[in-house]
Structures are given as structure tokens and as C-alpha cells.
């Protein structure tokens, strides 16, 4: 139990001190730390890999519980075959993806390179290249802080949506009601990936959308694509010191297209239902826009914040990535307020130009965007 700067455990490397910091390496330690803080009416902040978190320069005046439990356990093979795997919440997500390929657990290869821990993936329903983690999650075991009991959610009970779940929707005094302890995954077996759904990835693999490829090759191509956009952590590349995509792709009523340029890209909003999201239905009332397109066409180019008048916003300490417009990066000595300032400028500019409100993807603590 110590004081710790949150900049030391977040990928954007910003954030002031935690009044109390606890690194919990087992399920029992996690439950004890959270329960004790709750019993003392102490504010609680749950941190996994710190890749989706921005804390203000003032820090957090409460208890930070750093989830550091690790381990992967193969469970008895289910009646339907395949692989059933239980993973501790603090396990590094990308390490688990690599293991899944070695074990020929088919499915998550397209989610390679995403920073953070396994426990965070169901909260956000992490996704990339047309694949979402909800497609492979069987259940999630949690600690329910409201009633001080363990609670396990089956896939269908998690209410997965676009970067959303019941775990994200329920809060206790500003932090999650349900603390993820373990995640159970169910995979089919084989060396081939799930069908490739994303055109850019399919092209790099030399296959058509809907076809499969070797999972190991999919991982290699995804890591290369992400690295080209500064989306794989690299100590020598300042573009990777970020929270990844800062804004979600806006979901708007179909009628909103009438006020946007004809060439503004839009995509169907697909709702997944049934076990593992096997049933899909397209919304007739809403569409998904491209946040990157909106940002760029509102006048914000790669590297916004580094040169010219835009440098005055954060003194060049923070900027949009020089590789793409969706990430806000720490150029070396940024404060949290510098990140927030760039975010506010971009958000206001898009709203003024297109009338669309961008929604931040990372959790923001004690800051204003």
C-alpha cells in the first residue's frame, strides 16, 4: 500500500498521484482491497493495463487497485467441442492472443496488438478489424461491490454493444460496480482464423473479405498494420504513447446523413444477439460514422498540436498522432491537461463543422473534455 503516480501505470504516461495504491496479484487480494476501501467509504479506481485511462494531473484522492492477477487455465472440454479457457483478469491481452495462436484456439488473431489486460476486454467489448471479443466470451466472473458477492455473467447477460457492456454501464460512486476477476472464453479449434471481415486486412493477407487465413499470418499482418498507425506500444515512437483511438465512431440517426457531405462514410449498426453474438441484425434507424473522417474533414490533420497556431493549445507537448487522426499522443512531457486540451479542440471543431458530438473512448478521471 503506497502512493504512486498514475503516469507510471498508464500508456499515455499522464496522471497525478494516487493517495493509496494497491497492486493486487490474486483474486483474494483484489476482493480484499476493493471491499476494504468500500467499507471505509473510500473512492476506488480500478486499473488494469492503463491503456484506456486518463487521470488528471491532480491524481486520484482515494484507493487505486491495480489488477495484476495472471494465469490461463484450460477447462474440461465442453460438450460442443472446442476449447474452454479461463483467464485471470490481469493477464496481458496480447500475450493471451499469442498463446491462443500457439494452441490453435481460433478467433482472436485479429485482436492482436491491443494494449491492456484481459479483464478490461469485456467491459469495453474490445474490437478491431471487424472482430469483437464478445464473439468468444462464454462468461465473466466478477465481484459485485453493491451487494458484496461474487457474480458470474453468461455471454447473453453481458448486453454487449459497440464498445459497451453491462459492466461498463453500472457504476458505484464513479467506478465500476462489477470488478472483473476472470474471463472464460470458448474457441473452436484450428489454425485458421475466423472469417476476415475488414477490407484493409483482407488486402494485406491476399484474401477476399469473408475468407479465412492462417491465424499466425493474420496476427503478423495486424501487428504490422497497427504499428504503421502507431497503435503498438514502442518506447522509441512517441505516437504510441496514447490511449489508442481517443473517440468512438459516432452512432447517429439515419436522418443525420442529410446534413453531412454525400461522401461522408457511414456503416450499418449491427446488433449481435444470441450466444456469442451469432445472430446479427442491422439497425434501420441508426448508422455509424467514421470519427477519423470527421476529424480530418473538420480541419484537423495528423500532428495537429505540433506546429503553427495549433501548437499554442498544448505547447507541442501533446498532439494528434503523426500517423493518423484518432489518437492523442504524449510527445514526451505532456500533462494530462495538455491531452484534454487537444481533445476539447478536436471535439469542438467537429461539433461546429458537422453538428456531431464525438464521445471519448478512454475513461477520464477528474478531467474535463
Residue ranges of predicted features:
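Anion-binding (especially nucleotide phosphate/pyrophosphate-binding) glycine-rich loop
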Residues: 1-147, 157
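Phosphate/pyrophosphate- and phosphate-bearing ligand-binding catalytic cores of soluble enzymes
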Residues: 8-11, 150-328, 333-337, 353-369
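Short, low-complexity, polar/charged sequence segments that are solvent-exposed and flexible
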Residues: 40-43, 65-66, 84-87, 104-108, ...
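Short amphipathic alpha-helices in soluble, non-transmembrane regions
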Residues: 33-37, 197-201, 342-346
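Beta-rich strand-turn-strand
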Residues: 102, 335-342
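Residue-level signal for inorganic ion chemistry
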Residues: 26, 50, 116, 148, ...
Amino acid at each position: 500500500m503506497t502512493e504512486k503516480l498514475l503516469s507510471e501505470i498508464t500508456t499515455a504516461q499522464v496522471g497525478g498521484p494516487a493517495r493509496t495504491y494497491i497492486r493486487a496479484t490474486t483474486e483474494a487480494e483484489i476482493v480484499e482491497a476493493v471491499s476494504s476501501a468500500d467499507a471505509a467509504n473510500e473512492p476506488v479506481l480500478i486499473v488494469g493495463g492503463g491503456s484506456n485511462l486518463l487521470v488528471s494531473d491532480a491524481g486520484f484522492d482515494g484507493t487505486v487497485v491495480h489488477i495484476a492477477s495472471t494465469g490461463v487455465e484450460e477447462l474440461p472440454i465442453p460438450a460442443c467441442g472446442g476449447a474452454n479457457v479461463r483467464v485471470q483478469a490481469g493477464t496481458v491481452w496480447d500475450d493471451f492472443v499469442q498463446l491462443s495462436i500457439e494452441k490453435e484456439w481460433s478467433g482472436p488473431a485479429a485482436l492482436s496488438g491491443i494494449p491492456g489486460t484481459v479483464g478490461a476486454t469485456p467491459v469495453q467489448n474490445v474490437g478491431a478489424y471487424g472482430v469483437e471479443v464478445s464473439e468468444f466470451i462464454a462468461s465473466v466472473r466478477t465481484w459485485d461491490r453493491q451487494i458484496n458477492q461474487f457474480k458470474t455473467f453468461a455471454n447473453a447477460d453481458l448486453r454487449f454493444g459497440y464498445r459497451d457492456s453491462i459492466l461498463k454501464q453500472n457504476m458505484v460512486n464513479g467506478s465500476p460496480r462489477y470488478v472483473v476477476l476472470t474471463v472464460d472464453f470458448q474457441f473452436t479449434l484450428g489454425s485458421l482464423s475466423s472469417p476476415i471481415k475488414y477490407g484493409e486486412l483482407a488486402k494485406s493477407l491476399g484474401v477476399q473479405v469473408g475468407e479465412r487465413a492462417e491465424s499466425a499470418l493474420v496476427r503478423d499482418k495486424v501487428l504490422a498494420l497497427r504499428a504503421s498507425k502507431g497503435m503498438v506500444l514502442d518506447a522509441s515512437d512517441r505516437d504510441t504513447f496514447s490511449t489508442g483511438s481517443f473517440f468512438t465512431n459516432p452512432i447517429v440517426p439515419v436522418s443525420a446523413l442529410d446534413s453531412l457531405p454525400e461522401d461522408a462514410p457511414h456503416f450499418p449498426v449491427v446488433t449481435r444477439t444470441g450466444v456469442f453474438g451469432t445472430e446479427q441484425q442491422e439497425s434501420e434507424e441508426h448508422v455509424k460514422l467514421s470519427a477519423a473522417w470527421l476529424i480530418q474533414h473538420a480541419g484537423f490533420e495528423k500532428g495537429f498540436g505540433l506546429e503553427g497556431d495549433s501548437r499554442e493549445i498544448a505547447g507541442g507537448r501533446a498532439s494528434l498522432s503523426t500517423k493518423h487522426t484518432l489518437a492523442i499522443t504524449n510527445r514526451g512531457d505532456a500533462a494530462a491537461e495538455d491531452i484534454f486540451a487537444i481533445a476539447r479542440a478536436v471535439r469542438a471543431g467537429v461539433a461546429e463543422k458537422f453538428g456531431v458530438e464525438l464521445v471519448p473512448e478512454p475513461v477520464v478521471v477528474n478531467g474535463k473534455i
